Regions:
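Loop/turn segments within WD40 beta-propeller blades
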Residues: 50-56, 97-103, 152-158
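Inter-blade linker and blade-boundary elements of WD-repeat/beta-propeller domains
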Residues: 26-42, 77-93, 123-148
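Beta-strand-rich domains and repeat architectures in extracellular enzymes and scaffolds
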Residues: 39-66
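Conserved strand-to-loop turn within each blade of WD40 beta-propeller repeats
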Residues: 62-65, 109-112, 120, 164-166
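Intrinsically disordered, low-complexity acidic/Ser/Thr/Pro-rich linker and tail segments
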Residues: 1-44, 48-49
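Solenoidal tandem-repeat scaffolds enriched in leucines and small polar residues
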Residues: 143-166
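WD40-repeat beta-propellers
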Residues: 68-74, 116-120
Length: 166
């Protein structure tokens, strides 16, 4: 009975162990040099896309509120506001954001059939064409005919990216 009692006390001690702070876990296991954290609160709905430029100085956030917000850590005021907000495609939630590895252009994908590319300051550079939904043989149309679900830049060539859809 005493062995069972000691074992249950050890189990209780193990169960009551404190839950580690997320930042501490990241520092220890991922080797990330984290010293500070902040909360960027400006979207009105759930954030579902983040893009971080290679230097870590700029972040793009996208949301189901249809907006993309650009944050610049070097020039951010103490009120932690984004320096630019825009809606890439009216009434379509943002699905994915990605900065190009070299040029810093921003690939913006939302639940629409047309990918968009913006420059580092959020100015629209390109809107790619939609595929022809009435084409019988889909091999003869270019572009998506339905929602885009994913995409990424080519790792070595900033003039190319790939997208996938439903």
């Amino acid at each position: 009975a005493q062995e069972h009692n000691e074992a249950s006390q050890e189990e209780e001690k193990e169960e009551k162990a404190p839950v580690p702070d997320t930042l501490d876990v990241l520092k220890e296991y991922a080797g990330l040099p984290l010293t500070r954290s902040i909360q960027l609160k400006d979207h009105t709905k759930s954030v579902c896309a983040l893009g971080i430029d290679r230097s870590g100085a700029r972040v793009a956030s996208g949301s189901t509120d249809y907006d993309v917000k650009l944050w610049d850590f070097g020039g951010m005021a103490s009120n932690l506001s984004p320096f630019k907000t825009f809606e890439p495609a009216e009434n379509y939630p943002v699905i994915q954001l990605a900065f190009a590895p070299q040029s810093k252009n921003l690939l913006c994908l939302n639940a629409a059939p047309q990918p968009r590319v913006y420059d580092y300051d959020g100015n629209e550079l390109a809107v790619y064409k939609k595929g022809d939904v009435f084409m019988r043989d889909m091999r003869h149309t270019t572009g998506h005919i339905s929602d885009i679900t994913c995409g990424m830049w080519h790792p070595l060539d900033d003039t190319h990216f790939m997208t996938g859809g439903s």
